[in-house]
């Protein structure tokens, strides 16, 4: 199938200093959708401080990719000023084509075998106490990149023994044994985002399967109950409140500990439209409902993103588990897993 480039559209046309291939070739045929003006409650500070520049320099010096940049995260200024960055491993090109995502799609390059050590070096240079590592989908790899995740976790622990590690993984769809490899590396937090309610998967996340993702999170707890599990969704894609509440029930049935809910923001005219900007009071209502259903921690605001305030949230997660279970049951579960 031929891909026709719209050279008049500044959002999709190739940059003069970039390869001719468009960033999202599978979206080139889609009609333009107007990008709505953001409401007053969605405002962020433009990046540009000295600490932001230092973080950027460390990322560049190690030839690393961050989801902060690739996904166009609105919180990049705040996070990088704190020397926090979410590392995206296994390249900058994803094998999926989700309609909400700004990450480049196509056929990825071979894995950089030195990348785990490069990430570990950057974590040490930044002095991170808590690091988040995510990846593109790599359906082209036999294990979906599970071994690469494992090697990255091990490298970080070796270089920075006091640093806690949070991972945000793809779904490892049709990759038997992949999840077990990642869990065996013992990340402190295992995050896999549901992204949206099941009724929107066909248009928003067509390469994934809703109940496979639920089962993935459930399986993590079965393999190692001491690992915190986490998942997130976007709202504003046309979902109904009752669908979000049902998703909460599905995640609690999988014993997920932490739920994040944020406003979907449309990256370009070729991406899924924003159906509605959800006001802050509705986010607060979602938070109240989620806590009532038993989540240990909930973050629900328009600018909530999976990795936003991840270090602070990890401390809150540990405190919430301790308050709920007490020190004896927590210690017993750790001993059981390590036995």
Curated annotation (Swiss-Prot):
Molecular function GO labels: 4 iron, 4 sulfur cluster binding; lipoate synthase activity; metal ion binding
Listed EC numbers: 2.8.1.8
SMART domains referenced in this protein's UniProt entry, alphabetically: Elp3
Pathway: Protein modification; protein lipoylation via endogenous pathway; protein N(6)-(lipoyl)lysine from octanoyl-[acyl-carrier-protein]: step 2/2
Organism lineage: Bacteria, Pseudomonadati, Pseudomonadota, Alphaproteobacteria, Hyphomicrobiales
Name assigned to this protein: Lipoyl synthase
Alphabetical list of CDD domains matching this protein: Radical_SAM
Localization, UniProt: Cytoplasm
Catalytic activities: [[Fe-S] cluster scaffold protein carrying a second [4Fe-4S](2+) cluster] + N(6)-octanoyl-L-lysyl-[protein] + 2 oxidized [2Fe-2S]-[ferredoxin] + 2 S-adenosyl-L-methionine + 4 H(+) = [[Fe-S] cluster scaffold protein] + N(6)-[(R)-dihydrolipoyl]-L-lysyl-[protein] + 4 Fe(3+) + 2 hydrogen sulfide + 2 5'-deoxyadenosine + 2 L-methionine + 2 reduced [2Fe-2S]-[ferredoxin]
InterPro entries associated with the record: Aldolase_TIM (IPR013785), Elp3/MiaA/NifB-like_rSAM (IPR006638), Lipoyl_synth (IPR003698), rSAM (IPR007197)
Gene Ontology cellular-component annotations: cytoplasm
Chain ranges of the Radical SAM core domain: 80-296
Keywords: 4Fe-4S, Cytoplasm, Iron, Iron-sulfur, Metal-binding, S-adenosyl-L-methionine, Transferase
Primary location group: cytoplasm
Family according to the record: Belongs to the radical SAM superfamily. Lipoyl synthase family.
Domain of life: Bacteria
Region (Disordered): 13-35
GN (gene name): lipA
Pfam families xrefs: Radical_SAM
